[in-house]
A protein has these predicted regions:
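Core catalytic lobe of class I
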Residues: 2-241, 248-250
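Class I S-adenosyl-L-methionine-dependent methyltransferase module
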Residues: 244-258
């Protein structure tokens, strides 16, 4: 049987790959699973040129989304340590299936975080969606790790006199999207600032961080930058190659000259 090595990523279906990881092995999972919303991955918007967007984005059929969610969340629960946590990002369209799967698997919801970003997609006959959901869950509430003062000290203040520690721990995060103009990119990626924030609050150096839907490799790349061990699976060969190249070159952004 193939052995999964950490500090390495794999071009593999995560449902197959996670079965090769021992139970109670992973400290932290951060992931943004595929959509089921007819997402137009090649659309040239927000300064994104079609020619720079790597093809291959995979979606899940809406009628299959609950079972898909249950399957990968169940495996995630198996490989998480008792002290481990998971952050699942989702649009509102797929949120119901994910929340039901979390309950049925037996994980505990710690927080429901809102990522508020700038510039939602323009709409005609409904309100503009300009946020994303992040469900923070844990395996064992009594053993869950959370490093409360990893980013700001208890008495650190902003210029206007407010507590930076309190503000940073609020459950609405206003963090800008990253736009890689003129550079190769995948259609979706979480900003490095979000991943750094999660890594600092829910892991420490040399912990093992895992992403079952690696995409462009953000979780692995940022995890490596912060001295975490990493692992992840990406089923799309083009995305895997892109992520592998970023890790190999130790470069956050790649352009066509690289």
């Amino acid at each position: 049987m193939e052995k999964i090595i950490f500090d390495k990523i794999y071009n593999k279906n995560c449902l197959d790959g996670m079965k090769l990881i021992d139970k109670n092995k992973i400290d932290l999972i951060i992931t943004d699973p595929p959509f089921a919303i007819n997402f137009k991955a090649k659309k040239a918007n927000y300064n994104r040129k079609d020619s720079n967007v790597i093809e291959g984005y995979n979606e899940i059929l809406p009628e299959d989304y609950y079972q898909f969610s249950y399957d990968w969340i169940s495996e995630s629960n198996r490989i998480l340590k008792e002290s481990g946590s998971m952050y699942i990002f989702s649009g509102w369209n797929n949120l119901k299936d994910i929340l039901i799967a979390i309950d049925n698997v037996g994980l505990t919801v710690v927080n429901h975080i809102i990522w508020k970003y700038q510039f939602g997609v323009v709409t005609k006959n409904k309100f503009v969606t300009s946020h994303y959901h992040c469900i923070y869950v844990c395996k064992n509430p009594k053993k869950r790790k959370f490093y409360s003062f990893s980013r700001y000290g208890k008495n650190e203040k902003s210029d206007d006199g407010h507590s930076l520690h309190y503000r940073d721990k609020e459950d609405v995060w206003e963090i800008k999207r990253e736009y890689w103009t003129g550079e190769d990119k995948t259609p979706t990626k979480l900003p490095a600032e979000i991943i750094k924030k999660i890594l600092l609050y829910s892991s420490k150096k040399h912990d093992i961080v895992f992403d079952p839907f690696l995409g462009s490799g953000q979780v692995a790349v940022v995890g490596k930058m912060l001295d975490r061990h990493f692992c992840g699976f990406e089923i799309v060969k083009e995305y895997y190659n892109f992520a592998q190249k970023r890790l190999r070159k130790n470069e956050y952004r790649l352009n066509k000259k690289n």
